[in-house]
């Protein structure tokens, strides 16, 4: 498995023909963040590889996730009567979240600044973004938690899916139109979330207990913002862009079936996980919410990464992701009553570990394969020969 190649020769050929095409119409991004990023990128030395910036930003989000896992493992820390997360943690999380957002904004600028833009860089960036979705949502959940002033773990599960589908919608657009329309909600949410973390450190989580308007709690505002952004901004914009491409006869996939293929695996993942939650003999989501969310987010990231590879290489998206097969077996065992409460927890942890290892293996092998194909180092701007590239991959674990 160490040398397994996930990218087919047809896809490699498609990557050779790939040209970046994206459109950002968000006023916040255009008039505030891009000028800010243009200034920040000048701080970085020209020898620094863009992929290293991308990976560093991603690891900041992972650190935030792990930090709050330690202080708030079960999402009760913000509830009345429970030991709260220390104020300094919220400051750290807020700063690191904004730093990660900034690094995500400057990596592409660093690539253009150093004349090192490659399809691998875009795939690396968006692939890590797909995994970041679960870290964003689960980390911010700790502000409100699952107590009487928060939202239930099932509501958060549904909100997580709203975010996941909003993310994949952009790449579904590009799969069909050839243009990546950058979503408005991302920039707005990142700036808002970073600000809320800092405010929480100043006023304490108790401030979110109080109604902010007409007896509506801040948790209701949190929920309404996620759903409203998806239904009123992300979805309408995606459908409009798809319709415009249809009217101009520039759609890459003419049949409805082929256009909708990228949604099959995410919808099946949602169905299987929801059935598991509803049929669970031990109420698995109540017992292990953080692990369950992470399992869902990791499987989703793998599905999305495969879609990104296909849309960048102009190849057909696979209808079914193989990670769903073991999940199907676990859900079947739950439905027929073959999984006891203790066994069910063990199955969840095993499945999560398997998904994580499988997704990391997929990412490492794809980066390794594309690095060889484009004759580049993934984390260095030095130009290698083929022998040196192989040694570098071994040294960094690729």
UniProtKB/Swiss-Prot annotation:
Membrane-crossing residue ranges in chain numbering: 47-69, 84-103, 123-145, 150-172, 179-201, 221-243, 256-278, 291-310, 319-341, 345-367
Family: Belongs to the CDP-alcohol phosphatidyltransferase class-I family.
Primary subcellular site in the record, as a coarse category: endoplasmic reticulum
Enzyme Commission number(s): 2.7.8.1
Stored Pfam families: CDP-OH_P_transf (PF01066)
Cofactor needs: Mg(2+); Mn(2+)
Compartmental location: Endoplasmic reticulum membrane
Source species, domain of life: Eukaryota
Reaction equations catalysed: CDP-ethanolamine + a 1,2-diacyl-sn-glycerol = a 1,2-diacyl-sn-glycero-3-phosphoethanolamine + CMP + H(+); 1-O-alkyl-2-acyl-sn-glycerol + CDP-ethanolamine = a 1-O-alkyl-2-acyl-sn-glycero-3-phosphoethanolamine + CMP + H(+)
UniProt-listed Gene3D superfamilies: 1.20.120.1760
Knockout consequences: Embryonic lethality before uterine implantation of embryos on 6 days post coitum (dpc). Conditional deletion in the nervous system leads to motor deficits and neuropathology, including hypomyelination, elevated reactive gliosis and microcephaly. At the cellular level, deletion in the nervous system affects brain lipid composition, characterized by decreased levels of all phosphoethanolamine (PE), such as diacyl-PE, plasmanyl-PE and plasmenyl-PE.
PANTHER family: ETHANOLAMINEPHOSPHOTRANSFERASE, ETHANOLAMINEPHOSPHOTRANSFERASE 1
A GO cellular component entry from the record: endoplasmic reticulum membrane
Role, per record: Ethanolaminephosphotransferase that catalyzes the transfer of phosphoethanolamine (PE) from CDP-ethanolamine to lipid acceptors, the final step in the synthesis of PE via the 'Kennedy' pathway. PE is the second most abundant phospholipid of membranes in mammals and is involved in various membrane-related cellular processes. The enzyme is critical for the synthesis of several PE species and also catalyzes the synthesis of plasmanyl-PE, a lipid required for proper myelination and neurodevelopment, from 1-alkyl-2-acylglycerol.
Membrane topology listed for this record: Multi-pass membrane protein
Name of the featured protein: Ethanolaminephosphotransferase 1
Modified residues (N-acetylalanine): 2
Listed pathway(s): Phospholipid metabolism; phosphatidylethanolamine biosynthesis; phosphatidylethanolamine from ethanolamine: step 3/3
One BP term from GO: phosphatidylethanolamine biosynthetic process
Gene Ontology MF terms in the entry: ethanolaminephosphotransferase activity; metal ion binding
Listed PROSITE patterns: CDP_ALCOHOL_P_TRANSF (PS00379)
InterPro entries for this protein: CDP-OH_P_trans, CDP-OH_PTrfase_TM_dom, CDP_ALCOHOL_P_TRANSF_CS, CHOPT
């Amino acid at each position: 498995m160490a040398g397994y190649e996930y990218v087919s020769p047809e896809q490699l050929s498609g990557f050779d023909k790939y040209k970046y095409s994206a459109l950002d119409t968000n006023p916040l991004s255009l008039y505030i963040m891009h000028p800010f990023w243009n200034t920040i990128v000048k701080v970085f030395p020209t020898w620094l590889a863009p992929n290293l910036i991308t990976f560093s930003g991603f690891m900041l989000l992972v650190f935030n996730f792990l930090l709050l896992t330690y202080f708030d493992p079960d999402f009760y820390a913000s509830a009345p009567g429970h030991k709260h997360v220390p104020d300094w943690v919220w400051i750290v999380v807020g700063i690191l979240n904004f730093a990660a957002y900034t690094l995500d904004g400057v990596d592409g600028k660093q690539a253009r600044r150093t004349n090192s833009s490659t399809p691998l860089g875009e795939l690396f960036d968006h692939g890590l973004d797909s995994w970041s979705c679960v870290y964003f949502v689960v980390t911010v959940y700790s502000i409100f938690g699952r107590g009487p002033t928060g939202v239930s773990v099932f509501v958060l599960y549904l909100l997580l899916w709203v975010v996941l589908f909003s993310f994949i919608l952009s790449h579904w657009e590009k799969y069909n139109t050839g243009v990546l329309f950058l979503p408005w909600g991302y920039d707005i949410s990142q700036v808002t979330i970073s600000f809320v973390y800092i405010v929480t450190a100043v006023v304490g989580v108790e401030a979110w207990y109080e109604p902010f308007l007409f007896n509506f709690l801040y948790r209701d505002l949190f929920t309404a913002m996620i759903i409203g952004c998806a239904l009123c901004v992300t979805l309408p914009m995606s459908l409009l862009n798809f319709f415009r491409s249809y009217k101009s006869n520039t759609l890459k996939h003419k049949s409805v079936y082929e256009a909708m293929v990228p949604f099959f695996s995410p919808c099946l993942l949602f169905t299987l996980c929801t059935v598991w939650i509803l049929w669970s003999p031990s109420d698995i989501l109540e017992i292990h919410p953080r692990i369950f969310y992470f399992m869902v987010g990791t499987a989703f990231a793998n599905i999305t990464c495969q879609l990104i590879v296909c849309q960048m290489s102009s190849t057909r998206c696979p209808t079914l992701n193989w990670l769903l097969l073991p999940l199907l077996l676990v859900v079947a065992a739950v439905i027929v009553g073959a999984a006891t409460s203790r066994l069910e927890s063990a199955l969840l942890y095993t499945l999560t570990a398997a998904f994580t290892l499988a997704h990391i293996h997929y990412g490492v092998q794809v980066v390794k394969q594309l690095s060889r194909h484009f004759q580049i180092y993934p984390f260095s701007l030095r130009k290698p020969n083929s022998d040196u590239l192989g040694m570098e991959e071994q040294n960094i674990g690729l």
